[in-house]
């Protein structure tokens, strides 16, 4: 029941979010299409989705830069798109 509630909350957040694009469930990057990675859910690391790589100005995780990554990602953020780097910007890390 707890998992069901988490999924419902996730779907509601996505429905009202302008930036979230989810392309499918996954376990590893190789299951996702080009330009995406298999990122952990922000609510449960046991749930992963294929999401787009970061564009300029979007949040990123500095230690998450290899695509495809062989293991299971622990971050809910994908690396930046090719040609961009994940750099500290104020209190957060952003693709630039």
Curated annotation (Swiss-Prot):
Molecular-function GO terms, alphabetical: toxin activity
One Gene Ontology CC term in the entry: extracellular region
Q: Where in the cell is it found?
A: Secreted
Alphabetized Gene3D superfamilies for the sequence: Lipase, subunit A
Q: Which domain of life is it from?
A: Eukaryota
Q: Name one Pfam family in it.
A: Prokineticin
Q: Kindly state the tissue distribution recorded for this protein.
A: Expressed by the skin glands.
User: From which residue to which does the signal peptide run?
Assistant: 1-19
Q: What keywords are assigned to this protein?
A: Disulfide bond, G-protein coupled receptor impairing toxin, Secreted, Signal, Toxin
Which cysteine pairs make disulfide bonds? Answer: 26-38, 32-50, 37-78, 60-86, 80-95
Write out the ranges of the annotated region (May be important for binding to prokineticin receptor 2): 20-24
GO biological process: what's one of them?
Answer: endothelial cell proliferation
Q: What does this protein do?
A: Potent agonist for both PKR1/PROKR1 and PKR2/PROKR2, and inducer of a potent and long-lasting hyperalgesia. Shows an EC(50) of 0.264 nM, when tested on neuroblastoma cells (SH-SY5Y) which endogenously express mainly PKR2/PROKR2. Also potentiates capsaicin-induced TRPV1 current, when tested on DRG neurons. Induces a biphasic hyperalgesia to tactile and thermal stimuli after systemic injection of this protein into rat.
What the record says about family reads:
Belongs to the AVIT (prokineticin) family.
Please identify the protein, giving its name as recorded: Prokineticin Bv8
Provide the species name: Bombina variegata
Taxonomic lineage of this organism?
Eukaryota, Metazoa, Chordata, Craniata, Vertebrata
């Amino acid at each position: 029941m707890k998992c069901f509630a988490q999924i419902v909350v996730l779907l509601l957040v996505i429905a009202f979010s302008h930036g979230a694009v989810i392309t499918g469930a996954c376990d590893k990057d190789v299951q996702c299409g080009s330009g995406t990675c298999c990122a952990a859910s922000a609510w449960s690391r046991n749930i992963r989705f294929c999401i787009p790589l970061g564009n300029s100005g979007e949040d990123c995780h500095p230690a998450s830069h290899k695509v495809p990554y062989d293991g299971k990602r622990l971050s809910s953020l994908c690396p930046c798109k090719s040609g961009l780097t994940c750099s500290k910007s104020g209190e957060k890390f952003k693709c630039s």
